[in-house]
Amino acid sequence: MKKLGDVAFWRIAMRPGRPMAVGRIAADGLQEESAAGARRTSASSSQNDRNRAILFGLPGNPVAVMVTFFAFVRPALLRMMGARAEAPVLLRAASEEPLRKKPGRTEYQRGIVTQHPDGRLTVRTTGNQGSGVLSSMAQANGLIVLGHGQGDVAVGDQVSVMMFEGAVG
């Protein structure tokens, strides 16, 4: 991607999805090198944005692709289309099981959220959270979001949950 354009970022502190990249490339794929060694697109500066495409480099594992698409790519595409892309709504739910988490990165664990007759929400994982376990995404109705500095979660602790649109039930 560096040869075709500019890398905005590469690798993020999240799991799954760490090897995600975002950048801009010249629409015609051509770059010019200035005498000082700085790259620029072959288009004039006034046409620069129109002649550049945004490139999302997604991870290789299917679950990591789905998580990064849901968390980053979908909102970006909606904004680019002129739609109002609001930040995903985070609900709070009580964890039905202990969750292991090391501080230092944000984790998105696939979860099954249940709304009880009294209105309270609980969540449990779909089981194995490996980024290649596609069935974990198929079973989930949301993502348990464990923040960057957060550690382990005990049964009954409140956690943030990002729902897949309207899937509580």
Give the label of every model feature segment.
Residues K2-G169:
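Flexible glycine/proline-rich
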